UniProtKB/Swiss-Prot annotation:
GO terms for molecular function: RNA binding; structural constituent of ribosome. Keywords: Ribonucleoprotein, Ribosomal protein. Disulfide bonds: none annotated. Signal peptide: none annotated. PANTHER family: 60S RIBOSOMAL PROTEIN L14, LARGE RIBOSOMAL SUBUNIT PROTEIN EL14. It comes from the Archaea. One of its GO terms (cellular component) is cytosolic large ribosomal subunit. This is Large ribosomal subunit protein eL14.
């Protein structure tokens, strides 16, 4: 299983957004990360418990705390869809 790290694509497995893909934008502490759908799906930029995420093998090369626009551009360059 891939580790939770900045730029990692993950699937939300709990809560109202379960089943949707997100990008880890920042690591807050050992239990929480900042995730975003980068405007490509309905997941807004928010804090999420790492226990509610299932990391995928895909990863985009972004800086820690990158904006949604930067993340969206990196996803398009990598050819990764969050649908």
């Amino acid at each position: 299983m891939p580790a939770i790290e900045v730029g990692r694509i993950a699937v939300v497995i709990a809560g109202r957004r379960a089943g949707q893909k997100v990008v880890v934008a920042d690591i807050i502490d050992k239990n929480f990360v900042l995730v975003t759908g980068a405007g490509l799906n309905k997941v807004k930029r928010r804090r999420m418990n790492v226990k509610h995420l299932e990391p995928l093998p895909e990863r985009v090369n972004i800086e820690r705390g990158a904006s949604d626009e930067e993340i969206k551009k990196a996803l398009e360059e990598a050819g990764i869809s969050l649908e």
